[in-house]
Amino acid sequence: MALTTPKPGTRPTTDRTKEAIFSLLDSWGVLDDARVLDLFAGTGALGVEALSRGARELVAVESAAPAAALIAKTLTALKHNRSWEPGMSARVVKARAEKYAAAASAVAPFDVIFIDPPYAFETEACNQLLADLAGRESGELTGEGTVIVLERSTRSDEPTAPEGWDITDRRDYGETAVYY
């Protein structure tokens, strides 16, 4: 299914980067029946790809109304596709990712969290978002086995893992650095 990109300001993950991310996630076996949170969802491509590879639930968080509307349209089309299985769910939350990470609650932790902010998103803000995800107590969005996939510009300062978390890998794909 081809995804549409809202005009200005949305930088979709390149096919090469997306394939590399999902190849690694597949090798770790974390996508089967996964609950996926896609922060700064943009086109929704990462979340939709996760669903196509076995995830059962997607929450896509996007603050830009045109982008959120396009994701909703894509998810509606996907739900009418024969590949959609009973038990799968997907929804869009129109909110700022930072506010969602700091305040939202979940019935169970997410297995995979994609964080793909604009390249101009400051490293301090990125570190705060990670700290907010790590510091939650009730309605936690993360659990012990949660895999975080963070995309940044290779020119950005490296993010700092919150206490108790580790950045275990960094892979560069052109202008994009992906942290796990």
Protein language model regions, located:
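Class I S-adenosyl-L-methionine-dependent methyltransferase catalytic core
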Residues: M1-Y180
